[in-house]
């Protein structure tokens, strides 16, 4: 099992804290939060001597693939740079947000938004494949429900070459049935963003800080996606508490039968 720590709690200068993460755990970085020089310098530090793997979260700020107002040509340029990062530093996957909130411009149609999101996702996936990059489609946290569970699975599920990262916190927030999601997508789920919440917001709590039955989750994980990477995407550190949460998580994993 690959366990990866997101650098979400350590954006910017504070990324140096990630050097304290034990070397067996990997790192997931947000590509848009640094230029090439920044990542050249920082990855030398945080990945030095590390057996854990690197993954990269693709750009998402001000990007909504479902919106007519999205400048998709600029999005493609941004992802080309990100795919270059993936290959330069041998990252195992790149994460894609396939849509944002429901656009607020007059005349937006939900069905057209789903179609636009799918078409653009497929184009980015083709670009990724041409570069030998594994692009993973993530479920979103927005409670205004541009895509609920049914729409997400109906829109992206039939495209058999697509691969997925399921964000547990986003699924919890929107009351998705995780057993149904995992049993539908199965081993096309290549990774998870692991975090929790109380249904009151996308708070990115650590395993053990929220109400989720993680033993039940790991029963489904073992049945349907046993090789998927676990990316701990927490809002806060410190590193020692993140590592402690891994111990809690693994207790649930071992208890899952």
Where in this protein do the model-derived segments appear?
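N-terminal pre-domain/capping segments
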Residues: 1-87, 254-257
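Alpha-helical scaffold elements within enzyme catalytic domains, especially in hydrolases
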Residues: 19-21, 45-46, 85-88, 123-127, ...
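Acidic-and-aromatic substrate-binding clefts and catalytic sites of carbohydrate-active enzymes
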Residues: 7-17, 30-44, 63-73, 102-106, ...
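Active-site acidic/histidine proton-transfer and metal-coordination neighborhood
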Residues: 71-164
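Hydrophobic faces of well-ordered beta-strands that scaffold small-molecule active sites
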Residues: 2-7, 25-29, 54-58, 94-96, ...
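Conserved radical SAM core fold
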Residues: 60-64, 100-104, 196-202
